[in-house]
Swiss-Prot record:
Gene assigned in the entry: rpmI
InterPro entries named in the record: Ribosomal_bL35 (IPR001706), Ribosomal_bL35-like (IPR021137), Ribosomal_bL35_CS (IPR018265), Ribosomal_bL35_sf (IPR037229)
Domain of life: Bacteria
Full protein name: Large ribosomal subunit protein bL35
Keyword Ribonucleoprotein included in the entry's annotation: yes
Length: 64
């Protein structure tokens, strides 16, 4: 059997923490920021953890 390939889109978007959870960045902070409040853009700068419902599929994409 050949080796499984990691999903290249997933490996760019998700990072594994030391405890085994997955980190992701939040949406809506790429462009059109001039009409968004500064409080919103600061809040969106923080990373979030992936929900457990999605984590199983993402880990499969990453080959973990």
């Amino acid at each position: 059997m050949p080796k499984m390939k990691t999903h290249s889109g997933a490996k760019k978007r998700f990072k594994l923490t030391g405890s085994g959870k997955l980190k992701r960045q939040q949406a809506n902070r790429r462009h059109y920021l001039e009409h968004k409040p500064s409080t919103l853009t600061r809040r969106l700068a923080a990373d979030k953890t992936v929900s457990p419902a999605d984590a199983k599929n993402i880990k499969k994409m990453l080959g973990i």
